[in-house]
């Protein structure tokens, strides 16, 4: 199932590799959508607001693990492109133990800071009880999140995007079934929704880990390693930490904005909770295409095929922008029907606030599509620090403008919505300008471009 992205048609290679990743992350969204849909319809607005705020917090915590795994995955892809099997084995071993230790530490901190986090997010009193109960259970799934993301990153780095999809499919179906049983059948409320998600996360995490141990020689050969060079560990930690910072800063900004949203009351909280799910679902394919593009670039960077990388850049921009235009049109037109999937038709205020959010964000998906390509490009070219810079610009703008604009009575919550696309485009301009200036150093021309 491994796909060598250094050979064959550029566009076809990227698309065939990206499709399972896109399907897999759409199913990942089903974890969250199942909770939101069932909670919103059967447990009411307070429970929906609690789960929605918890989702934003969990996205931030998950982004720390995901960033570490993505950083390691980029190095795995480069080693694979270089055909450096021993180096790949060392990287896998160093990454696994480092990220596992970070995961344990993160889990402990999450529980110790549980009540402080609720205060930081300005959670209304009527939502506090449900949110605390939900988070207490959902934090138990963090090790499962690590297992899945680590081994999925490894498999994708060597061109296998199908197996992660298989395990996510099984766990997503289980999550939905357990949601219905625990919430409707067993009447376990928001705790039941959390339990369903945790069980599904462990199924996918343990399952993909067992698969990698049984089927991947690079993983099995870890047992033969007698020692690890500190230089290798240092490289892994440096690269992964920068990617982790990029991912966590991005979601810390979103978490900060969540606290501002919560200050506008339960109606806006519930609208934001539902609209963010739709928003994430809509642009998830371009995010995954950006990650697939990153693996393509990293493998070819390791193989020193810069001519192929340049061709891939042109193809990726065309594919991503075309998709963004289609999705923007669909979200803008169908914003109201999409909101009614998560919110009862009688909740007019919630629906209207959500529609307003979706139509503003949805009109500018080309901005986030370009930004995902830039993140993937700089990560693959061993410039993760540039991804951090772009994230700080995007999220710094978003947070600053959100607080400034929302404080103006005539603007209010709409200022929060508009701050998002403005941040995207400022980061895009910075990333494109940097690439234009440094292009020939980042991608020196080959004597004969290899296709």
What are these model-derived regions, one by one?
Residues 1-18, 76-143, 185-241, 297-364, ...:
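Short alpha-helical transmembrane segments in multi-pass integral membrane proteins
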Residues 30-49, 118-125, 181-188, 248-277, ...:
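Helix-terminus/linker motif at the lipid-water interface of multi-pass membrane proteins
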Residues 45-56, 135, 194, 266-281, ...:
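Small-residue hotspots at the loop-to-helix junctions and early N-terminal turns
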Residues 69, 137-156, 164-172, 193-208, ...:
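Short runs within selected transmembrane alpha-helices of multi-pass transporters and secretion channels
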């Amino acid at each position: 199932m491994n796909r060598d992205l250094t050979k064959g048609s550029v566009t076809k290679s990227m698309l065939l590799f990206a499709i399972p990743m896109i399907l897999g992350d759409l199913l990942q969204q089903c974890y969250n959508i199942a909770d939101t849909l069932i909670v919103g319809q059967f447990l009411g607005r307070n429970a929906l607001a609690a789960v929605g705020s918890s989702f934003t917090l969990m996205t931030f915590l998950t982004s720390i693990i995901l960033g570490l795994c993505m950083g390691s995955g980029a190095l795995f892809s480069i080693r694979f492109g270089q055909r450096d099997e021993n180096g790949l084995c060392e990287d896998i071993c160093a990454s696994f133990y480092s990220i596992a230790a970070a995961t344990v530490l993160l889990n402990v901190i999450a529980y110790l800071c549980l009540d402080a986090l609720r205060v930081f997010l300005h959670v209304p009193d009527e939502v506090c009880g449900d949110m605390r109960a939900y988070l207490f259970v959902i934090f138990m799934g963090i090790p499962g999140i690590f297992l899945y993301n680590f081994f999925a990153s490894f498999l994708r780095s060597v061109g296998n995007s199908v197996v992660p999809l298989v395990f996510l499919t099984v766990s997503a179906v289980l999550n939905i079934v357990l949601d219905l049983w625990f919430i409707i059948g067993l009447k376990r409320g928001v705790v039941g929704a959390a339990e369903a998600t945790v069980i599904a996360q462990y199924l996918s995490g343990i399952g993909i880990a067992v698969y990698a141990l049984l089927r991947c020689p690079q993983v099995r050969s870890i047992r033969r390693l007698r020692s690890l060079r500190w230089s290798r560990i240092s490289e892994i930690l440096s690269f992964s930490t920068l990617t982790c910072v990029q991912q966590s800063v991005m979601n810390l900004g979103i978490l900060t904005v969540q606290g501002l949203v919560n200050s506008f009351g339960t109606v806006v909280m519930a609208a934001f909770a539902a609209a963010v799910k739709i928003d994430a679902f809509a642009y998830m394919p371009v995010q995954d295409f950006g990650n697939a593009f990153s693996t393509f670039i990293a493998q070819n960077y390791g193989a020193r095929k810069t001519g192929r990388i340049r061709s891939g850049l042109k193809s990726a921009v065309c594919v991503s922008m075309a998709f963004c235009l289609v999705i923007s049109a669909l979200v803008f037109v169908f914003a109201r029907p999409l909101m009614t999937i998560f919110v009862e038709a009688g909740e007019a205020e919630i629906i209207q606030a959500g529609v307003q959010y979706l139509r503003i964000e949805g009109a500018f998906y080309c901005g986030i599509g370009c930004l995902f390509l830039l993140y993937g490009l700089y990560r693959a070219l061993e410039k993760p620090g540039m991804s951090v810079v772009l994230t700080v610009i995007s999220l710094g703008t978003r947070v600053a403008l959100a607080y400034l604009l929302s404080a103006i009575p005539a603007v209010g919550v709409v200022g929060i919505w508009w701050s998002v696309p403005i941040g995207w485009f400022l980061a895009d301009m910075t990333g494109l300008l940097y690439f234009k200036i440094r292009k020939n150093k980042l991608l020196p021309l080959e004597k004969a471009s290899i296709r």
